[in-house]
């Protein structure tokens, strides 16, 4: 038996995880995976095998690393001869087709679906920095980025990468669900270049030019900042500073791709 799954976005795969949780007497003894990149799946679609025949066990998880540098859009999972699979995870990084984005089209340059990602934060006690780029509004506080309460001088920060180079025209800061624990203020710095480890990038970010000067925030609110932005040219990275600490649900950087 087999099934075809379309990925949420095109991406470069680094590994697959086949999970047979709860399938103890009806799991498939074997499996293999094929991939392709295509707008439409039809009988003429060319599939590429990227894993060997895998041996599976019941109520188990198997991770298979792969090296496939070409972006893919679909996965075909074969199970031998039949049975049940609880989850298939496809690990990798988003790699959008930027030719499909118009020169004058305004998009969220930091969106997860566009390749935006969190790099590092000084604190992720209650929520991961990567949540800032997720689609939609946060479903609860745990679906955002929140730091512990700061008992020492200073402020908290997070560094993120845009999907590609872009000119930011509007910043949207959403503090959904954060009512007594939202940051009092925030600011944003930006840069076209960054290199090295996450820790090295964090050190570089301290001196990046200011994109959004320090502004006040409200609880459980979608803030739009456009006229407050400074012109620092196209950027690829940002540092979000929150004063002194707290939680932010989503960060949107609306603008145009710079090719």
What does each model-found stretch correspond to?
Residues 13-15, 28-30, 85, 168, ...:
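Exposed beta-strand and adjacent loop surfaces of beta-rich binding modules
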Residues 83-100, 246-259:
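Edge beta-strands of jelly-roll/beta-sandwich modules across compartments, strongly enriched
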Residues 1-6, 24, 93-163, 179-181, ...:
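Disordered, acidic Ser/Thr/Pro-rich linker "stalks" and the adjacent N-terminal cap
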Residues 11-25, 77, 166-178, 240:
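A short beta-strand element within beta-rich, extracytoplasmic domains
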Residues 24-38, 181-194:
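Short, surface-exposed beta-strand/strand-loop-strand elements in extracellular ectodomains
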Residues 19, 34-38, 91, 174, ...:
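Predominantly extracellular/luminal cell-surface or secreted proteins
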């Amino acid at each position: 038996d087999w099934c075809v799954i379309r990925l949420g976005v095109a991406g470069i795969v680094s590994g697959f995880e086949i999970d047979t949780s709860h399938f103890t007497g009806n799991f498939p003894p074997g499996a293999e995976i094929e991939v392709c990149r295509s707008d439409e799946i039809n009988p003429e679609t060319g599939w590429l095998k990227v894993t060997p025949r895998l041996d599976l066990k019941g109520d188990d998880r198997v991770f298979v690393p792969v090296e496939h540098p070409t972006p893919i859009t679909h996965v075909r999972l074969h199970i031998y001869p039949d049975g049940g699979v609880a989850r298939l995870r496809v690990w990798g990084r988003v790699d959008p087709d930027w030719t499909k984005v118009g020169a004058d089209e305004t998009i969220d340059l930091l969106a997860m679906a566009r390749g935006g990602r969190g790099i590092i934060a000084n604190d992720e006690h209650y929520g991961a920095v990567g949540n800032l780029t997720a689609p939609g509004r946060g479903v609860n506080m745990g679906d955002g980025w929140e730091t512990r309460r700061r008992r020492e001088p200073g402020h908290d920060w997070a560094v993120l990468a845009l999907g590609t180079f872009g000119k930011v025209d509007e910043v949207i800061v959403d503090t959904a669900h954060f009512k007594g624990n939202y940051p009092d203020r925030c600011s944003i710095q930006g840069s076209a270049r960054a290199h090295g480890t996450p820790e090295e990038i964090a050190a570089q970010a301290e001196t990046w030019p200011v994109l959004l000067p320090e502004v006040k925030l409200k609880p459980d609110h979608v803030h739009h900042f456009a006229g407050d932005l400074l012109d620092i040219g196209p950027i690829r990275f940002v540092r979000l500073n929150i004063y002194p600490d707290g939680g932010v649900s989503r960060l949107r950087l609306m603008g145009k791709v710079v090719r």
